[in-house]
């Protein structure tokens, strides 16, 4: 498939959506684009990476994406380098149903250069501000959130909130993460705290 019909405008629109998602953690941000997408991987994740990657970027793909048309599509349109180990990558894309790498095993940046950390994009089944059945339901707090935000997610491992607590505790080091469906992104910068409901 083709990339954006107009590369600069297409990339800028997706970049603005991603910036909005990071500026307002937990908010479901619609992603609009006109790119012809690969068959594999969630569309919002694919166009996010299409906008962000270039020839200097290392990308790690989870097993279901590694040998798919998504890998060839991103390499062709961005020139990115596919890396074998997630710990080497600036960007990590985890397909639906694939195991999430341990967040602390990814590039964490340093106190002096926290921006040298990895950005992780995870395909999920659904994203919603309301409490959905069969979803993990969280309350979020931190910079960019007025008091609290709520988020329901399906398709993440059951220990994700615990992993995220370790990621948050390492600030200013740590990874920033995007959750992606076919048409929405949710940003989770490392400054965001996830609060899980207390079990009765």
Locate the predicted segments by residue.
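Internal, well-folded beta-alpha domain core
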Residues: 68-187, 191-200
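N-terminal, charge-rich interaction modules
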Residues: 1-58, 62-65, 76-77, 183-184, ...
């Amino acid at each position: 498939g083709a990339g954006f019909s107009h590369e600069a405008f297409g990339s800028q629109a997706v970049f603005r959506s991603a910036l909005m998602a990071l500026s307002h953690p937990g908010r479901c941000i619609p992603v609009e684009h006109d790119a012809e997408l690969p068959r594999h991987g969630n569309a919002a994740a694919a166009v996010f990476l299409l906008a962000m990657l270039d020839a200097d970027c290392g990308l790690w793909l989870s097993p279901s994406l590694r040998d798919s048309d998504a890998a060839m599509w991103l390499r062709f349109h961005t020139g990115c380098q596919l890396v074998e180990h997630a710990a080497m990558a600036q960007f990590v894309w985890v397909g639906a149903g694939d195991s999430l790498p341990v967040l602390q095993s990814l590039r964490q940046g340093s106190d002096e250069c926290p921006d040298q950390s990895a950005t992780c994009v995870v395909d999920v089944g659904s994203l919603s501000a309301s409490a959905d059945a069969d979803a993990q339901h969280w309350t979020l707090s931190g910079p960019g959130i007025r008091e609290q935000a709520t988020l329901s997610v399906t398709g993440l491992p059951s220990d994700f909130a615990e992993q995220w607590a370790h990621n948050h505790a390492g600030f200013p080091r740590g990874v920033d993460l995007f959750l992606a469906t076919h048409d929405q992104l949710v940003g989770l910068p490392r400054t965001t705290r996830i609060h899980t409901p207390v079990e009765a």
